């Protein structure tokens, strides 16, 4: 009987695009030597829908329903960046009450996004229980969204100069109750997960990124803050009303998958602190800037002499973008979400360039997984937190 020689050649494996741990239609072409990862090549584009080109043929208000399909788990942030760009371009003032309502919605959306990151991340590394736990709190957030906006996910709530509607009666008390309840839920997560020896074995020291390396790769959000760089656009850019509240930037210096987990867990607690302060100090007044609805110039034949300003009370397609360029960014749950806008004295943007955080953060994946074990790919990819709708646009 002859014993066959061991094969020495490498194995190439496709992970995705249909794979339960891929977080969307991401395909990884992985080169393996046994269990060791030699190379990894991400293949993108399976969810490309031409979002930037669509923006060039829509007014801002017409485009708002599209943007909620970028990062469909944190839709308030895509709406915020879409209205912030023309607001800054046209120097439009947002009423204080509208700004406070926006902050509440953004932070609730941040918590919902982090929760739906935590559950699948834990499932990827073998812990099924938190996956079911996170839906309790997330469902309460979606109930609040539904009461305020009418929709659970694709809210279409932000408007140029404010928000679509005021908070309904009793909503503030309901939200305060949620904040008190959620803090106990986070304590439960920390007891279940943070010191679990099996969890620590899977994430500690896995996927380490140094601070300088994170900056060179252009990383942002929890990916950057977990590498020892306390950089948060809410503190840096002073947008909305974040300067009026007392909160801290959450960061860790280790740079591994555990650090990225800790940053996100602590960020949820900080978001609750911000929401509680907003709810206690929310002022009265209008929830949108009525001046935005006016024509900036007399009507012309561009709209076939149809009087658009009387269609409804919301900003009409006649809102013009002046001939200048602007880059606007917000601190989304996954990192820096930015839009580069070029106006052309038209109701349509001449160029609408999206800077999605997931697309930039995903670039470092091949470097992180090389020389690691095959099972570590899921841990590292899960700790990056990507949504393919925003990566492929």
Swiss-Prot record:
Which superkingdom does the taxonomy of this entry point to? Eukaryota
Compartments annotated for it: namely: Plastid, Chloroplast thylakoid membrane
Reactions it catalyzes = a plastoquinone + NADH + (n+1) H(+)(in) = a plastoquinol + NAD(+) + n H(+)(out); a plastoquinone + NADPH + (n+1) H(+)(in) = a plastoquinol + NADP(+) + n H(+)(out)
The family database entries (SUPFAM superfamilies) matched by this protein are listed as: HydB/Nqo4-like
Q: Could you give a single Gene Ontology term from the biological process aspect?
A: photosynthesis, light reaction
Q: Which UniProt keywords apply?
A: Chloroplast, Membrane, NAD, NADP, Plastid, Plastoquinone, Quinone, Thylakoid, Translocase, Transport
As recorded in UniProt, its EC number(s) are 7.1.1.-
Q: Which GO terms describe its cellular component?
A: chloroplast thylakoid membrane
* Molecular function terms, GO-annotated: NAD binding; oxidoreductase activity, acting on NAD(P)H, quinone or similar compound as acceptor; quinone binding
Alphabetized InterPro entries for the sequence: NADH_Q_OxRdtase_suD, NADH_UbQ_OxRdtase_49kDa_CS, NDH1_su_D/H, NiFe-Hase_large
State the Gene3D superfamilies in the record: Cytochrome-c3 Hydrogenase, chain B
The cysteines joined by S-S bonds are: none
Q: Name the membrane topology term.
A: Peripheral membrane protein
| Role this protein plays | NDH shuttles electrons from NAD(P)H:plastoquinone, via FMN and iron-sulfur (Fe-S) centers, to quinones in the photosynthetic chain and possibly in a chloroplast respiratory chain. The immediate electron acceptor for the enzyme in this species is believed to be plastoquinone. Couples the redox reaction to proton translocation, and thus conserves the redox energy in a proton gradient.
Tell me which NCBIfam families the record gives. Answer: PRK06075.1, PRK07415.1
Instruction: Please report which protein family the annotation says this sequence is part of.
Output: Belongs to the complex I 49 kDa subunit family.
| Assembly, per entry | NDH is composed of at least 16 different subunits, 5 of which are encoded in the nucleus.
Protein name (database record): NAD(P)H-quinone oxidoreductase subunit H, chloroplastic
What is the scientific name of the source organism? Ceratophyllum demersum (Rigid hornwort)
The major lineage groups are: Eukaryota, Viridiplantae, Streptophyta, Embryophyta, Tracheophyta
